[in-house]
């Protein structure tokens, strides 16, 4: 069996460092590992419209922004197929068939769906398209016979629901769909970065993000304004590093060479944490170090992004070619599904015999 990856992002805004440590850098590593036969990276515009139906221009404009972020982070169209979800109509047909295999109560029990309904204040009036997006995700994954789905920990219930659909379909119609496995980030600190305001989630809608496209000055301002330990009021006060956003970011981004270059008086992060926890280390010193680390890590990404931004026709062509390739793969899967369901009427030469 081929080893195939399917993953992607909703184009509701530029991607931020939470996306980078939570999924993008892992995708690039997997892409360059040579361990996978096919890799599909989807810009999920159709899914984005489930809660942005009245703002299609927002989705349209951000398709290009997400594509630029992908290329800037190192996703290579020669190794990974980058495509736009809505350009693959087969996904919609697969979603329709899978709806017959899932109950309303099962979707309602999905923890991710419940959390996102609450976050978007949809409790009183849930758009049907949004409510059904776990089924749409199952179509996305199975259309490419994905064996591996790199996602954040919060998406585990979605993949479990996808696997239930796969098992039900195969039990009813015969072995047709591939059972996918979740792939979590290898660095536990990178499962989810908090926002710079200390809130649990970095979110475009909350305005608490550091974007991959941010300028050096924007990065500096955001880092220096970050929430820290509220009990660490004075330099000499003992501080807490656990649940402290500045140290969570250092867990995710700092490397030994950063200490050698920017903070040589410390041997590494453990020594820095120990000093902060016993007192005598101010937040400004730690934030300045984090700023140096972030500038170093994000500089090459920003430079590649600026390079691709000057070649927009080429970016669109990459997306067009990728979408054509992805559609051919999805069409093949849809034919297999229709055959299994016995609704391939005009393809079945034995129908009238």
Model-predicted segments: where are they?
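N-terminal Rossmann-like or analogous alpha/beta NTP/dinucleotide-binding catalytic cores
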Residues: 2-139, 257, 296-298, 305-306
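Internal, conserved structured core segments that host functional sites
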Residues: 111-115, 119-169, 173, 194-197
């Amino acid at each position: 069996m081929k080893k195939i990856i399917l993953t992607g992002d909703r184009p509701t805004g530029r991607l931020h460092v939470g996306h980078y440590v939570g999924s993008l850098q892992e995708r690039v590593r997997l892409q360059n590992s040579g361990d996978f036969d096919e890799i599909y990276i989807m810009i999920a515009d159709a899914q984005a419209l489930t809660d942005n139906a009245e703002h299609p221009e927002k989705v349209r404009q951000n398709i290009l922004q997400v594509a630029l972020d992908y290329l800037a982070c190192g996703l290579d169209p020669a190794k990974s197929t980058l495509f736009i979800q809505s350009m693959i109509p087969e996904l919609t047909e697969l979603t329709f068939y899978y709806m017959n295999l899932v109950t309303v109560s099962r979707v309602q029990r999905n923890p991710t769906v419940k959390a996102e309904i609450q976050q978007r204040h949809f409790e009183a009036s849930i758009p049907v398209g949004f409510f059904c997006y776990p089924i749409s995700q199952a179509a996305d994954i199975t259309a490419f016979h994905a064996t591996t789905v790199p996602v954040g920990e919060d998406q585990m219930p979605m993949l479990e629901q996808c696997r239930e659909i796969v098992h039900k379909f195969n039990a009813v119609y015969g072995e047709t769909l591939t059972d996918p496995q979740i792939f979590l980030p290898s660095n536990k600190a990178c499962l989810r970065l908090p926002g710079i305001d200390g809130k649990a989630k970095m979110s475009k809608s909350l305005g608490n993000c550091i974007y991959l496209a941010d300028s050096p000055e924007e990065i500096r301002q955001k880092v220096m304004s970050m929430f820290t330990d509220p009990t660490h009021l004075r330099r000499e006060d003992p501080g807490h590093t656990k649940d402290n956003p500045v140290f969570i970011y250092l867990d995710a981004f700092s490397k030994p060479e950063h200490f050698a270059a920017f903070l040589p008086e410390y041997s590494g992060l453990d020594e820095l944490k120990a000093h902060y926890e016993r007192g005598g280390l101010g937040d400004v010193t730690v934030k300045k170090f984090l700023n140096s680390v972030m500038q170093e890590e994000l500089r090459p990404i920003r430079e590649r992004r600026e390079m691709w931004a000057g070649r927009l026709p080429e970016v669109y062509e990459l997306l067009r070619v990728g979408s054509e390739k992805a559609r051919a793969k999805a069409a093949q899967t849809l034919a297999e599904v229709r055959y299994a369901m016995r609704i391939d009427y005009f393809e079945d030469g034995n129908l009238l015999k």
